[in-house]
Amino acid sequence: MKTLLLTLVVVTIVCLDLGYTLTCLNCPEMFCGKFQICRNGEKICFKKLHQRRPLSWRYIRGCADTCPVGKPYEMIECCSTDKCNR
């Protein structure tokens, strides 16, 4: 009986997500379907749009610990919920 109880406790601990991990989209296309699980300490999802030439944008998405600072010809959006950087 003690073995069964100990086994249940171990399985419960292994299966529970004891900490919240943020999930952000991570791909260079306009319409993104790939995502990544952020590392410990990364609590921000971001989307960076970099204008390469008129009417041509490069998309960069991912996780960050703080919201990145934009450079000229860049737009940056930051958020803090799962897959919010669409």
Curated annotation (Swiss-Prot):
Name used for this protein in its record: Tryptophan-containing weak neurotoxin
Give the site residues for Important for interaction with human M1/CHRM1 and M3/CHRM3 mAChR, and muscle (Torpedo) and neuronal (alpha-7/CHRNA7) nAChR.
Answer: R52, R53
Disulphide bridges, residue numbers: C24-C45, C27-C32, C38-C63, C67-C78, C79-C84
Cite any additional comment in the entry. Answer: Exists in two form, due to cis-trans isomeriation of the peptide bond 53-Arg-Pro-54.
**Subcellular location(s) per record:** Secreted
Q: Which Pfam families match?
A: Toxin_cobra-type
**UniProt key word Manganese:** no
Describe its PTM? The disulfide bond Cys-27-Cys-32 is probably not needed for efficient interaction of the toxin with the target receptor (Torpedo muscle or alpha-7/CHRNA7 nAChR).
Record site: Important for interaction with human M1/CHRM1 and M3/CHRM3 mAChR, and only weakly for muscle (Torpedo) nAChR: R58
Keyword annotations of the record = Cardiotoxin, Disulfide bond, G-protein coupled acetylcholine receptor impairing toxin, G-protein coupled receptor impairing toxin, Neurotoxin, Postsynaptic neurotoxin, Secreted, Signal, Toxin
Q: How does it assemble?
A: Monomer in solution.
In which family does this protein belong, per the annotation?
Belongs to the three-finger toxin family. Ancestral subfamily. Orphan group II sub-subfamily.
Name residues in a coiled coil: none
> Mutating C32S has which effect?
About 3-fold increase in inhibition potency toward both muscle (Torpedo) and neuronal (alpha-7/CHRNA7) nAChR
Q: In which tissues is it expressed?
A: Expressed by the venom gland.
Q: What does this protein do?
A: Neurotoxin that irreversibly inhibits nicotinic acetylcholine receptors (nAChR) and allosterically interacts with muscarinic acetylcholine receptors (mAChR). The loop II is involved in the interaction of this toxin with nAChR and mAChR. On nAChR, it acts as a competitive antagonist (muscle-type and alpha-7/CHRNA7) with IC(50) values in the micromolar range. On mAChR, in presence of ACh, it partially inhibits the effect of acetylcholine (ACh) (allosteric antagonist), whereas in the absence of ACh, it activates the receptor (allosteric agonist).
Instruction: Provide the Gene Ontology terms for cellular component.
Output: extracellular region
What residue range is the signal peptide? Answer: 1-21
Q: Which GO terms describe its molecular function?
A: toxin activity
Q: What does the UniProt record report as the effect of altering W57A in this chain?
A: About 2.5-fold decrease in inhibition potency toward muscle (Torpedo) nAChR and no change in inhibition potency of neuronal (alpha-7/CHRNA7) nAChR
Instruction: Please name the CDD domains in this protein's record.
Output: TFP_snake_toxin
